[in-house]
Swiss-Prot record:
Protein name: Probable transaldolase
EC supergroup of this enzyme: transferase
UniProt organism field: Clostridium perfringens (strain 13 / Type A)
Catalytic reactions of this protein: D-sedoheptulose 7-phosphate + D-glyceraldehyde 3-phosphate = D-erythrose 4-phosphate + beta-D-fructose 6-phosphate
GO molecular function, one term: transaldolase activity
GO cellular component labels: cytoplasm
Length: 215
């Protein structure tokens, strides 16, 4: 499973990139708004740091405007993937953009059937939201498992991006469920690095070394 980072904070992306694990980035209008910067400027900088799919979301809710915005975003860099919300107008926009060779990531997926429709419309990626489903008492990982099984059964090559990832267990569950990608906040990536026994082991190695060499 590939690891994306879910942020528009350039410094977080830069730090995570140095770990050597990032294969892509997902952003959304809310994340970019937090940065208080021009969307084009932020995306260009992100593309200069990570050489992989960079998801940038349209703001429009009607097909024609989604397509127009998508075309403009796609001009920024060859790695741009257009994030489109799951809705009727969104599916129409995905079909048009896909016919023009522009990759899309259909977001706000909360059911396997939504994922199927998005894939058949031509989406390159679908993003089921784990955390938000958990919030309403529906285990988010269940739809990731169902989507992965359905896509494998029918030979659908649309990639699954597990999104709304809240903790390391979401990442592990996604990997075991067959998700192709998990897009992860920076703080969760840092949690994945840590383990109490690793820290204790490192401390003991240093203590033993210092004791042996009288340091």
């Amino acid at each position: 499973m590939k690891i994306f980072i879910d942020t528009a904070n350039v410094e977080e992306i830069r730090k995570a990139s140095k770990l050597g694990v990032l294969a892509g980035v997902t952003t959304n209008p809310s994340l970019i708004a937090k940065e208080g910067r021009d969307i084009k400027e932020v995306i260009e900088e992100i593309c200069s740091i990570v050489d992989g799919p960079i998801s940038a979301e349209v703001m429009a809710l009607e097909c024609d405007e989604m397509v127009r915005e998508g075309r403009e975003l796609a001009k920024i860099h060859k790695n741009i993937v257009i994030k489109i919300p799951m809705c009727e107008e969104g599916l129409k926009a995905v079909k048009v953009l896909a016919s023009e060779g522009i990759r899309t990531n259909v977001t706000l997926i909360f059911s396997p059937l939504q994922a199927l429709l998005a894939a058949r419309a031509g989406a390159s990626f679908v993003s089921p939201f784990l955390g938000r489903l958990d919030d309403i008492g529906n285990p988010g990982i269940e739809i990731v498992t169902q989507i992965a099984e359905m896509f494998a059964l029918h030979g659908i090559d649309t990639e699954i991006i597990s999104a709304s990832v809240r903790n390391p267990m979401h990442v592990l569950d996604s990997a075991m469920a067959g998700s192709h990608i998990a897009t992860i906040p920076y703080n969760v990536i840092l949690q994945m690095v840590k383990h109490p026994l690793t820290d204790a082991g490192m401390k003991k190695f240093i203590e033993d070394y210092n004791k042996a060499f009288n340091k």
